């Protein structure tokens, strides 16, 4: 999985960037999404607030903003078109590879790690996996969706080795 990482805060260590990369690759493998691409940007609460207002019309900072990329391509190609035109097939493959982007608030991650009594590393892993599941179509609007998403989230974090301790 290709993941573009951007630290707008200047506060994210190389180790934390590496952990985020690794846990997202681990989650991608679990979901069979190894061939996908995404972006992760680490932001401040101020920037998170701006993004939350812009994209979700919510006037406060949040821990992670997940923007799922759903291409709205109206052009239909049949298999023969793609076989006859390798460039078109490659373009369509690249177009389909990008699944979305996450904005993780470093400030919120620190606050929540302290509030929940676990490590900053655990909170960052939680936010990365939570956002990753969102951009892969998981949600928690209903009790059933919440049970499925949170169960999978905990399964990934535990298998990776990021427990609540």
UniProtKB/Swiss-Prot annotation:
Sorted alphabetically, which InterPro entries does this protein's record hold?
Answer: MetalPrtase_cat_dom_sf_prd, YbeY, YbeY_CS
Q: Please name the Gene3D superfamilies in this protein's record.
A: Metalloproteases ('zincins'), catalytic domain (3.40.390.30)
What is the predominant subcellular site recorded for this chain?
A: cytoplasm
Source taxon at top rank: Bacteria
Q: Which GO terms describe its biological process?
A: rRNA processing
Q: Which residues form a coiled coil?
A: none
**What GO cellular-component annotations does this UniProt entry give?**
cytoplasm
User: Could you say which cofactors this protein requires?
Assistant: Zn(2+)
Q: What EC designation does it have?
A: 3.1.-.-
Q: Give the residues the record marks as binding Zn(2+).
A: 130, 134, 140
> Where's it found, cell-wise?
Cytoplasm
Listed GO MF terms: metalloendopeptidase activity; RNA endonuclease activity; zinc ion binding
How many cofactors are bound and how?
Answer: Binds 1 zinc ion.
Q: Does the keyword Cytoplasm apply?
A: yes
Q: Which keywords has UniProt assigned to this entry?
A: Cytoplasm, Endonuclease, Hydrolase, Metal-binding, Nuclease, Ribosome biogenesis, rRNA processing, Zinc
What Pfam families does the record tag this protein with?
A: YbeY (PF02130)
Principal EC category: hydrolase
Report the function annotation for this chain: Single strand-specific metallo-endoribonuclease involved in late-stage 70S ribosome quality control and in maturation of the 3' terminus of the 16S rRNA.
Q: Which HAMAP family match?
A: Endoribonucl_YbeY
Q: Hey, which family's this protein in?
A: Belongs to the endoribonuclease YbeY family.
What protein name does the entry list?
A: Endoribonuclease YbeY
- Its source organism is Streptococcus pneumoniae serotype 19F (strain G54)
Name the gene for this chain. ybeY
């Amino acid at each position: 999985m290709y993941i573009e990482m951007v630290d707008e805060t200047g506060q994210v260590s190389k180790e934390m960037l590496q952990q985020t990369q690794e846990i997202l690759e681990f989650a991608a493998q679990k979901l069979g999404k190894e061939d996908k691409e995404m972006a992760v940007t680490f932001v401040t609460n101020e920037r998170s607030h701006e993004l939350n207002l812009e994209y979700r019309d919510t006037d406060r900072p949040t821990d992670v903003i997940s923007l799922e990329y759903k291409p709205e391509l109206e052009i239909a190609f049949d298999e023969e078109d793609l076989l006859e035109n390798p460039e078109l097939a490659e373009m369509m493959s690249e177009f389909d590879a990008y699944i979305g982007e996450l904005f993780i608030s470093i400030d919120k991650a620190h606050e929540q790690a302290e509030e929940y009594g676990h490590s900053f590393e655990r909170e960052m892993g939680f936010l990365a996996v939570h956002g990753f599941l969102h951009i892969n179509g998981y949600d928690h609007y209903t009790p059933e969706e919440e049970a499925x998403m949170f169960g999978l989230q905990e399964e990934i974090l535990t298998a990776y080795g990021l427990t609540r301790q």
